[in-house]
Design a protein with these regions (language model features):
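Carbohydrate-active catalytic/glycan-binding domains of CAZyme proteins
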Residues: 1-164
Length: 164
């Protein structure tokens, strides 16, 4: 597993100034840092308990050659318009590499307003990602974190929210 040394000299804020991001997961694939954040759009929606104040319609993947290098927005990686079961709210994703493919695991709301977990696949860590036609059955959840264990088994940990 690749290691990156964290020092005070590496502190930087913000990573990008062109888009609003939140809730990232970060991974090192082939010696490069990839960051998978939520992408929120600016809007005038009021805050409410349904999360309607979040207009999260797509994912961008950020990348860095090192902690001291410029952070690059690699553009659109996946849009809600390309995911058949999704109505809105693409929240905090995660990504793993397995057998030469990259799997973006993400929560989103369906057309009934329920959160589910979905999966999209790419040959590249920056996408574009092709979504599976359906969400993971029984996954009424948010904030997936995916782990490939030492025995090569894959685990998905997640949180519940609003019926999850």
């Amino acid at each position: 597993m690749a290691k990156i040394k964290l020092e005070r000299a590496n502190e930087r804020t913000p990573l990008v100034k062109t888009i609003y991001t939140a809730d990232p997961s970060a991974h090192v694939f082939d010696g490069k840092i990839y960051i998978y954040p939520s992408h929120d759009f600016e809007h005038d929606c009021p805050d409410d308990d349904n999360g309607d104040q979040y207009i999260m319609q797509d994912y961008h993947v950020l990348s860095m050659d090192s902690l001291d290098s410029e952070c690059v927005d690699n553009g659109l990686a996946l849009s809600q318009d390309d995911i058949p079961w999704v109505k809105n709210q693409l929240w905090a994703p995660d990504c793993i590499c397995r057998n030469g493919k990259y799997y973006l695991v993400f929560p989103a709301k369906d057309y009934e307003g329920q959160f589910h977990i979905g999966v999209a696949v790419s040959d590249s860590p920056v996408g574009p990602f092709t979504p599976q036609e359906n969400c993971i059955e029984g996954s009424y959840s948010i904030d997936p974190a995916v782990l490939v264990d030492d025995d090569d088994r894959v685990y998905c940990y997640y949180g519940g929210l609003w019926g999850g």
